[in-house]
């Protein structure tokens, strides 16, 4: 049973997924929403062009609930992390726009979740970091790889080994966040940001562009022509 309460609902073509688990939205299960549940919801809501992920209340998520580590064996922790990694890989490869609305603390697994999104809109009071080294471990859900791709290998290495917690402005200067907002505006600005991107394009166009860029990142060569053909058929094949 997943003890993290994650709610997803639709606002027109924009879906909002909210993480809720106490004041700090701790991730007591790496699979903070069941992967199959998320995919089923998106299948049942085919009008969805964008997904915004946020944390309820003051914080996005302070990451793993480390108090549970003592009660679990290494094997069960590893199995749970594999589920969490698979979920974040799924979010990263969704063929729709994904935006994290980062309010307050966004640490460890919380930042790993945010980095699985294509964009991160942060409150001016947000703090972000992969802080796992403080607890004697390293990020286990793909966060090291994603951070390296986003900010570069050298900056990622320094951040991870020092467990550095960045201000929103510093994260912006490094390219870790897309935009910094006023203290309480991260979520409304993220919703507006998503709406501005998707409002004038079709779902076919969104799918084509995102799938092409994902394939390029994954090492596939020349994936763009198939995407062009898909949009060509939609635009002129009637």
What feature does the model see in each segment?
Residues 32-33, 40, 47, 55-89, ...:
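Glycine- (often His-adjacent) and acidic-residue-rich active-site loop
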Residues 119, 158, 162-164, 170, ...:
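Well-ordered beta-strand positions
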Residues 121-126, 177-223:
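C-terminal long alpha-helix characteristic of the crotonase
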Residues 88-135:
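Glycine-rich beta-to-alpha active-site loop
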Residues 63-64, 147, 155-164:
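Short helix- or helix-capping micro-motifs
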Residues 1-56, 89:
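Conserved CoA-thioester-binding segment of acyl-CoA-metabolizing enzymes
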Residues 53, 65, 113-115, 171, ...:
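Hydrophobic/aromatic residues within transmembrane alpha-helices
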């Amino acid at each position: 049973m997943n003890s993290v309460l994650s709610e997803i609902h639709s606002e027109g073509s924009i879906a909002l997924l909210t993480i809720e688990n106490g004041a700090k939205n701790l991730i007591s299960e790496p699979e903070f929403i069941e992967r199959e549940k998320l995919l089923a919801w998106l299948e049942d809501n085919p009008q969805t062009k964008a997904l915004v992920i946020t944390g309820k209340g003051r914080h996005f998520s302070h990451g793993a609930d480390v108090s549970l580590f003592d009660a679990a064996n290494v094997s069960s922790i590893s199995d749970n992390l594999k589920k969490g990694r698979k979920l974040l890989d799924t979010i990263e490869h969704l063929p729709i726009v994904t935006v994290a609305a980062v309010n307050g603390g966004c640490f460890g697994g919380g930042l790993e979740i945010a980095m699985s999104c294509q964009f991160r809109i942060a409150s001016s009071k947000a703090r972000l970091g992969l802080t796992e080294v403080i607890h004697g471990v390293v990020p286990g859900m793909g966060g090291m790889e994603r951070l390296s791709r986003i900010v570069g290998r050298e900056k990622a290495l320094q951040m991870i080994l020092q467990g550095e917690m960045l201000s929103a402005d510093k994260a912006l200067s490094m390219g870790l966040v897309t935009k910094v907002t006023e203290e309480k505006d991260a979520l409304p600005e993220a919703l507006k940001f998503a709406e501005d991107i998707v409002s004038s394009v079709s779902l076919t166009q969104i799918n084509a562009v995102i799938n092409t860029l994902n394939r390029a990142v994954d090492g596939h060569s020349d994936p763009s022509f198939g995407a062009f053909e898909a949009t060509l058929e939609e635009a002129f094949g009637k």
